[in-house]
UniProtKB/Swiss-Prot annotation:
Residue intervals annotated with topology Extracellular: 36-88
Entry annotated with the keyword Cytoplasm: no
Segments in the Cytoplasmic topological domain: 1-13
Residue pairs linked by disulfide bridges in the UniProt entry: none
Subcellular localization: Membrane
Annotated keywords: Membrane, Transmembrane, Transmembrane helix
TM region(s), chain numbering: 14-35
Main location: membrane
Signal peptide residues on this chain, from the entry's feature table: none
Role summary: Associated with pathogen defense.
A Gene Ontology term for the protein's cellular component: membrane
Annotated protein name in UniProt: Protein WIR1A
Highest taxon of source: Eukaryota
Amino acid sequence: MASLGSSAGGRRPTVLLQIALFVVVAAIIINSSVCLGATAVHDAAASGTGALDPNVPAVPTPGGAGQPYTGRGCRTVYGCRPPAGGQP
């Protein structure tokens, strides 16, 4: 250790300080993420809207409520054939 000189003694507190700073920042980020997620879930449950409401679909239907899904049409690029008598 004596061959490392005085610079090694100065690096150790710096590395420990960097590790401590990393731990503090990680704890703040993790804590705020959990709190924000819990707040969003609580707000959705309390208001009765959102993905937690069984009467409201989590994903909107493409054609609107009660409308059939028409898709993107039939093109030769997709290799499909329109049904007899009309458009798909």
